[in-house]
Amino acid sequence: MWKGLERDENTEIQSSNESYIDDYNHYYICFFNPIIINGCLAKLLSFDSQRTEVYKDTDITHYQWYIGKNAKKEYADKWGMDESIFPESITDNMDVLDYKMVYYNPWDAQYLSYLVVEYDDKSYEEEIQRLEQYDSKEYKGYFGTRGFRDKYRLLAIEVDPDHGLIYALEEENNQIIYVELIFCNYFYDIDYQDEIDIQYLPIGFDATPDNEYHQKRLNQ
């Protein structure tokens, strides 16, 4: 009887030791195998990206939360780009016809905004003058951009070769369209074409992840 009991106890000890070894091997593989570490990290990044929501706001009364010197912290510095092409604030002489702000930040912040304003005659001329005095940058070739549609006249444009474009377009009926397309490292992670009227986008503009401009910059 005692011998049988000894065999049972030894079996339990052996089983316990085997379990310990299995646990050790498991943790060794998880923490010290680079391939598995990279795989786990990739899954973690993917999971975090999926949990990050695209934030959108179309309420014009929130305009100064996102644009100008009084913008909230996460919108105050958009990769160092100068967004003074946009109006500093919304005033009584502006009839806002359309507005949208999109923000996405899974790891690197991305912004898309547009504002369509109809001005009275006097204010329209003043705004045209302000924008024409802006130190506009050469933009063709960046992100595939070739120009703008014939119905618009480009009034001012800011360009960053890594982070995007900010510009203003003149349309008929005293209307001006302001657009900012700001992202990190040559492309958007959002479906930006679903967020803005494509008529407002430059001809040839491509900020999808596999865009040709992105590939050229990586190969430089």
Regions found by a protein language model. Give the residues of each.
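Cytosolic-side transmembrane helix boundary signature
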Residues: 1-24
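Extracytoplasmic electrostatic interaction patches
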Residues: 127-220
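Hydrophobic membrane-insertion alpha-helices, especially the h-region
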Residues: 20-39, 43
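Acidic/proline-rich low-complexity IDRs
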Residues: 4, 40-44, 96, 154, ...
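Polar low-complexity intrinsically disordered regions enriched in Ser/Thr and small residues
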Residues: 7, 71, 83, 144-147
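N-terminal export/targeting and maturation segments
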Residues: 35-119, 123
